[in-house]
UniProtKB/Swiss-Prot annotation:
Biological classification of the source: Bacteria, Pseudomonadati, Campylobacterota, Epsilonproteobacteria, Campylobacterales
NCBIfam families in alphabetical order: prfB
Species annotation: Helicobacter pylori (strain P12)
Its job: Peptide chain release factor 2 directs the termination of translation in response to the peptide chain termination codons UGA and UAA.
Chief location: cytoplasm
Official protein name in the record: Peptide chain release factor 2
UniProt family annotation: Belongs to the prokaryotic/mitochondrial release factor family.
InterPro entries attached to this UniProt entry: PCRF (IPR005139), Pep_chain_release_fac_I (IPR000352), Pep_chain_release_fac_I_sf (IPR045853), PrfB (IPR004374)
Length: 363
């Protein structure tokens, strides 16, 4: 990096920071935080528990956004000042340090951009994830289990928690399907663009001839809805099936019909849950999954109507990402058009760069 390149980077970052300020309006955020604090001082504040909870969530979000923005702006202003001084004094040591810190500064500005993008209605929610293997038997079932582990590792890296709702072992390896919740701040916001088909190309560990195989798996993401969001489901539109649990979480297999499957006839959506010994709890969890999927489907329809889109991104028809392990190693996302070479780390849950790249590409 040289003086000209760094100078252009600073101009670009300053321009981005100015645009961010126009969007978030820091002074208005401060005023809103003052208003919330006064509201919380009211003795009657906690009488409406749901409203109080939502107000607290908003306070945390605004505080975090303001703090992230201010910290980034201060760092950028300091870098601009140091750069001018170092240029005037021909201070090569300081210039070298500034060049080294440039990627960190760039990432800080990007982090604020991401914060703004995660301010949608459900972005702060937990994420319900369903993974289904495509055609191909063991190959696709193994690929589905690799994706499942990838998301679990991503959650672990962020300090998020996960909970299995339904898990079906594959016949030889992998899984026939899994549904689980990732619980953490902005989990849905980060993962919402994972909806679609994920493609794997590799030398098959199940092929004695060591041939290259292509496998597919479908990932669906929906927000875990708060209890105060009312989604009505007509009983005549659903069928409940009860069966014996099996697989992970179903160690009491063949004892009780505690697992629950719900089929929603108007949409064709099928959800199932077997993570608990209680049929009642499994039914409640399955209903929560169904409501989340119906809510997501309705939002998708509205968005497609607004954008006049002909095709949904959810389902088998839309391939969003390719993971190639042979003859070369590369992960490429179709939305951001960015290719990544750290395939092993990605499959171990290091997917923040991919998720953020897609958020920015779709902004």
């Amino acid at each position: 990096m040289d003086n000209y390149t760094y100078s252009e980077l600073l101009k670009s970052l300053q321009n981005k920071c100015d645009n961010i300020a126009l969007i978030i309006k820091p002074e208005k955020i401060k005023q809103e935080l003052e208003r919330i604090e006064k509201e919380q001082e009211d003795p009657n504040f906690w009488q409406d528990v749901l409203k109080a909870r939502d107000t607290n969530k908003e306070k945390v979000r605004l505080n975090r956004l303001l703090e992230t923005y201010q910290k980034t702006k201060d760092s950028l202003d300091e870098s601009v000042e140091l750069f001018e001084l170092a240029q005037n004094d021909n201070d090569e040591v300081t210039l070298s340090l500034l060049y080294e810190e440039a990627p960190t500064l760039e990432h800080s500005v990007q982090k604020v951009e991401i914060e703004i993008m995660l301010s949608g209605e459900n972005d702060a929610s937990n994420a319900i994830i369903t993974i289904q293997p495509g055609a191909g038997g063991t190959e696709s079932q193994d690929w589905a289990s690799i994706l499942y582990r990838m998301y679990l590792r991503w959650a672990e890296r962020r300090g998020f928690k996960s909970e299995i709702l339904d898990y079906q072992d594959g016949e030889e390896a992998g899984i026939k399907g899994v549904a689980f919740i990732i619980k953490g701040e902005n989990a849905y916001g980060y993962l919402k663009n994972e909806n679609g088909v994920h493609r794997l190309v590799r030398i098959s560990p199940f092929d004695a001839n060591a041939k290259r195989h292509t496998s597919f798996a479908s990932v669906q993401i929906s927000p875990e809805l708060d209890d105060d969001i009312d989604i009505e489901i007509d009983e005549k539109d659903v069928r409940y099936d009860y069966y014996r649990a099996s697989g992970a979480g179903g160690q009491h297999v063949n004892k009780t019909e505690s697992a629950v499957r719900i089929t929603h006839f108007p949409t064709g959506i099928v959800v199932q849950c077997q993570n608990d010994r209680s049929q009642h709890k499994n039914k409640a969890s399955a209903l929560k999954m169904l409501k989340s999927k119906l809510y997501e489907l309705e939002l998708e329809k509205q968005q497609n109507s607004t954008k006049n889109e002909e095709k949904s991104e959810i389902g088998w028809g839309h391939q969003i990402r390719s993971y190639v392990l042979a003859p070369y190693q590369q992960v490429k996302d179709a939305r951001s058009n960015i290719a990544y070479s750290n395939v092993e780390a990605i499959l171990d849950g290091d997917i923040d760069a991919i998720l953020e790249g897609v958020l920015i590409a779709k902004a």
